[in-house]
């Protein structure tokens, strides 16, 4: 998930990153 489409980062930083 996330606007970047990067689930690896979304799980840490949230949907904003």
UniProtKB/Swiss-Prot annotation:
Question: Which compartment or compartments is the protein found in?
Answer: Secreted
Q: Which GO terms describe its cellular component?
A: extracellular region
| PROSITE patterns per the UniProt record, alphabetical | PYROKININ
Highest taxon above the source species: Eukaryota
Task: Keyword check for Secreted, yes or no.
Answer: yes
Q: What does the record list as GO biological process?
A: neuropeptide signaling pathway
Which Gene Ontology molecular-function terms are recorded?
Answer: neuropeptide hormone activity
The reply to whether Secreted figures as a keyword in the UniProt entry is yes
Protein family: Belongs to the pyrokinin family.
Q: Report the protein's function.
A: Myoactive.
Q: What is this protein called?
A: Pyrokinin-5
């Amino acid at each position: 998930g996330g606007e970047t489409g990067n689930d690896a980062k979304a799980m840490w930083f949230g949907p904003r990153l």
